[in-house]
Amino acid sequence: MDYWILLVLAFLVADKSWHLTGLLATKLTSPERLQQLIRERQELHQQQQSLSAQDHYAKWTKNNRRLDVLDRDIARVRKNYLESVEATKARLAKLKLLVVTVPFTALKFYKGKLPVYALPKGMFPRFIEGTLEHGWLYMALAPLNMKQFSEGASVAVSLGIWLFALLRVLGAIEFVLETLREQNPQVATETAKVHARTAQAASAN
């Protein structure tokens, strides 16, 4: 497989799996302090439930004040935690723009006409074959006869068109997965395996 195609696939994998960095950011921004406060409140609340306000008024009142303090602390720490996670995700989004989106877009423009594979000439109407070979620009220039077909018995499929088709397929699969995940998580997991095999097959081609 051509080096440029492998590079495009690498960018594609990075683009489609970048959302995992958000999960990683959530894990790295440890909510340990928040969890500790929540556990403390749960334990104190259980203790408070077992006390009688009449028989243990002083302790019951003290626990109530402590619960109020814990509620405020939990709200403050949760807010700080969520802000920290969002700030990390924003930095990751900027990083993606620099290391994935911009280079990937530039590469697609630079190598968009690179032949990926060939189809027998005559399989599709001339207009479609011209688009497969020259990309979307052919649609605008075809009436002017400014784009010519390559000689031979086959029509080369350009990298830009191949990538467009692959992204459309992946987008459709992602939509189906999201729909299944909402309806049946187990079915979504099985479909995800099919998705992985499809991506592997595309890489092999």
Swiss-Prot record:
Gene Ontology cellular component? Answer: endoplasmic reticulum membrane; GET complex; Golgi membrane
Give residue ranges on the Lumenal side.
1-3, 118-156
* PANTHER family per UniProt: GUIDED ENTRY OF TAIL-ANCHORED PROTEINS FACTOR 1 (PTHR42650:SF1), TAIL-ANCHORED PROTEIN INSERTION RECEPTOR WRB (PTHR42650)
**Biological processes, Gene Ontology terms:** tail-anchored membrane protein insertion into ER membrane; vesicle-mediated transport
Q: Where in the cell is it found?
A: Endoplasmic reticulum membrane; Golgi apparatus membrane
InterPro entries according to UniProt? Get1, Get1_fungi, Helix_hairpin_bin_sf
Keyword Transmembrane, does the record have it?
yes
Look up and give the membrane topology term. Answer: Multi-pass membrane protein
- Subunit structure as annotated in this protein's UniProt entry: Component of the Golgi to ER traffic (GET) complex, which is composed of GET1, GET2 and GET3. Within the complex, GET1 and GET2 form a heterotetramer which is stabilized by phosphatidylinositol binding and which binds to the GET3 homodimer.
Where are the membrane-spanning stretches? 4-24, 97-117, 157-173
Pfam families, A to Z? CHD5
What is known about what this protein does?
A: Required for the post-translational delivery of tail-anchored (TA) proteins to the endoplasmic reticulum. Together with GET2, acts as a membrane receptor for soluble GET3, which recognizes and selectively binds the transmembrane domain of TA proteins in the cytosol. The GET complex cooperates with the HDEL receptor ERD2 to mediate the ATP-dependent retrieval of resident ER proteins that contain a C-terminal H-D-E-L retention signal from the Golgi to the ER.
Could you list which ranges are Cytoplasmic topological domains?
25-96, 174-205
Would you identify the family this protein belongs to, as annotated? Belongs to the WRB/GET1 family.
Gene responsible for this protein: GET1
The record's section on HAMAP family has: Get1
Q: Any idea which UniProt keywords this protein has?
A: Coiled coil, Endoplasmic reticulum, ER-Golgi transport, Golgi apparatus, Membrane, Transmembrane, Transmembrane helix, Transport
List where this protein forms a coiled coil. 32-96
Tell me, in one coarse class, where this protein mainly resides.
endoplasmic reticulum
Output this protein's name. Golgi to ER traffic protein 1
